[in-house]
């Protein structure tokens, strides 16, 4: 396509609008400031639940959760009668089986869980003869088979033609450092920067999805207003692309650039165990599961889901009304007949069919065939503990329908 510029999508995980705007204005993130000055800026809205696998699947497919079928960081697989855990924490991964969790996060999310008819941007572009590239993107399904760099860890996968995934999959030899050698100091973003520099130097793609997760990692630990050092590292990673092209002007002459986050973050002040509100039901246990279980609970960060199992002798409304009494929960959502119902403090909220705000996002989330029968959005300052009992109190989290998330 003569005259068509190539495109780079940069996603800085967990970067909030307030932090971005302050960094751009103060120029503490000079590359981001330069891009903001050269382009246009607007605030965007994440999907619900506003969690990385869900949001990145939406970015990769252009579809809402009811289209791509990724419902949460953790969910109950009705067909396989087990819990899928993509990595809420190491404790949560151990609770379901660490090897199984690694396989789900790296392989099965793309090979099996992502809807077959939700075409990814990599698939669409390469079907048209263009070269797609992805760096560290968890949602990567493409047309090209890739073998892992470490045999036996996971099986081969199908990704874009140029595919780099945390040193585990590398379509090309770039000389980039190991991605997992010091996460708190930005090792993953440093790996992405080295790979991105290599790609831009060779002009080796028509589309690049460039994903930087280290800011989110720091923000979980330090809070959204305390991760300035991590943002500076993310800025340098984007700067590596700019430098490889010969400076900002040359970079923007060659590429169109979209820079965004996948979701926001808000401060966490208290944990809440969703299972505690349902203790008089028989609950499914990820290890040592019980065949007489009535409910399965999937919770992490600031969103949760409850599944009614075949043994349950209760309607979704009864469970939802129980949950809506909890001060730790802001909104509880469920289906009744063909209607989507939302409860807040026991009162029913209207969900009009044409609402494009939080109500529309809630409907799309509940319509996902892998979602629970009841969805919950945590109240401000509350985080739902994961299967390992972990939370981010004192730091930041996300997942809810509230604006900051």
Where are these regions (language model features)?
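Extreme N-terminal starter segment of soluble prokaryotic enzymes
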Residues: 3-8
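Metal-dependent active-site segment of extracytoplasmic phospho-/sulfohydrolases and closely related
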Residues: 9, 31, 233-276, 376
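Glycine-rich, histidine-containing beta strand-loop boundary motifs that form or position
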Residues: 9-12, 45, 134-138, 211-212, ...
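Short, structured active-site-proximal loop/turn typified by the sulfatase FGly-forming signature C/S-X-P-X-R
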Residues: 21-70, 74, 133
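Short secondary-structure boundary/capping segments
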Residues: 24-27, 148-152, 223-228, 271-278, ...
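Short, solvent-exposed loop/turn segments at the edges of secondary structure
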Residues: 53-54, 252, 269-273, 278, ...
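His/Asp/Glu-rich, glycine-adjacent segments
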Residues: 63-224, 327, 331, 339-351, ...
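Active-site neighborhoods of enzymes that stabilize oxyanions during catalysis
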Residues: 117-118, 291-405
């Amino acid at each position: 396509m003569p005259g068509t510029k190539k495109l780079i999508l940069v996603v800085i995980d967990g970067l909030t609008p307030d932090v971005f705007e302050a960094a751009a204005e103060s120029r503490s993130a000079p590359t981001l400031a330069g891009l903001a000055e050269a382009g246009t800026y607007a605030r965007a809205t994440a999907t619900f639940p506003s969690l990385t696998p869900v949001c990145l699947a939406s970015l990769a497919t252009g579809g809402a959760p009811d289209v791509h079928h990724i419902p949460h960081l953790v969910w109950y697989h009705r067909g396989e009668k087990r819990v899928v855990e993509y990595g809420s924490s190491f404790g949560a991964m151990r609770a379901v089986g660490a090897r199984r969790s690694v396989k789900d996060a790296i392989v099965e999310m793309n090979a099996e869980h992502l809807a077959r008819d939700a075409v990814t941007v990599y698939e669409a572009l390469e079907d048209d003869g263009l070269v797609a590239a992805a760096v560290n993107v968890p949602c990567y399904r493409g047309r090209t088979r890739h073998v892992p760099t470490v045999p036996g860890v996971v099986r081969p996968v199908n990704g874009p033609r140029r595919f780099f995934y945390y040193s585990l999959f590398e379509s090309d030899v770039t000389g980039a450092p190991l991605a997992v050698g010091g996460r708190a100091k930005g090792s993953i973003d440093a790996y992405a920067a080295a790979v991105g520099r290599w790609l831009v130097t060779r002009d080796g793609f028509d589309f690049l999805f460039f994903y930087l997760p280290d800011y989110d990692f720091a923000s979980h630990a330090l809070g959204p207003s305390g991760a300035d050092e991590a943002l500076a590292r993310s800025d340098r990673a984007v700067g590596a692309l700019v430098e490889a092209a010969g400076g900002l002007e040359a970079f923007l002459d060659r590429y169109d650039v979209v820079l965004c986050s996948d979701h926001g973050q808000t401060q966490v002040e208290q944990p809440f165990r969703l299972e505690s509100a349902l203790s008089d039901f028989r609950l499914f246990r990820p290890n040592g599961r019980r065949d007489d279980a009535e409910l399965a609970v999937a919770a992490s960060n600031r969103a949760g889901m409850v599944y009614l199992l075949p043994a349950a002798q209760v309607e979704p409304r009864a469970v939802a009304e129980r949950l809506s009494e909890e001060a730790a929960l802001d909104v509880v959502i469920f289906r009744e007949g063909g209607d989507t119902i939302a409860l807040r403090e026991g009162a029913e909220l209207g969900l009009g069919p044409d609402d494009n705000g939080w109500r529309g996002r809630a409907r799309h989330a509940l319509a996902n065939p892998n979602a629970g029968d009841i969805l919950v959005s945590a109240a401000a300052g509350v985080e739902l503990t994961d299967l390992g009992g972990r939370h981010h109190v004192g730091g930041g989290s996300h997942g809810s329908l509230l604006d900051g998330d």
